[in-house]
Amino acid sequence: MAGKVVMYTDGACKGNPGPGGWGVVLRYGDACKTMHGGELQTTNNRMELMAAIRGLRELKRACQVELYTDSQYVRKGITEWMSGWKRNGWKTSAKKPVKNADLWQELDAETARHTVNWHWVKGHSGHPDNELADELANRGVRELNGA
């Protein structure tokens, strides 16, 4: 397995649903890479998921990943809820279809390639890399509008 990667992810949405963006900060040793993008019609939760997917997809080899998100939806989904969803055919405990199942399945596939430790960080609390991921996600939204 390749080295240790530290990843910060964030999503943003102007309106929910509405135009949204995602941002990723990847750190490997002294190297830092940032990524961002957006979608015209989406939700905040979809952008939070997309940030994690795109960050993990960017890693070319299997890595030990310390992934930080300010989304309890993403962290709890992957660490607590997903095994039940998979067991229930992507249905919730209330027998309803899992929201964003397409992205949860993509995240599951990307996660399988790596050893990922999931961490929650309080958003907008001054952590530099979380703030940068937030800035990148908002840039993804702005660029949709040609700003």
From Swiss-Prot:
GO-annotated molecular function: magnesium ion binding; nucleic acid binding; RNA-DNA hybrid ribonuclease activity
CDD domains with a match to the protein in the record: RNase_HI_prokaryote_like
Residues annotated as binding Mg(2+) 2: D10, D134
Binding site for Mg(2+) 1: D10, E48, D70
Database matches in InterPro entries: RNase_H, RNaseH-like_sf, RNaseH_domain, RNaseH_sf, RNaseHI
Record GO cellular component, one term: cytoplasm
Protein name: Ribonuclease H
Gene name of the record: rnhA
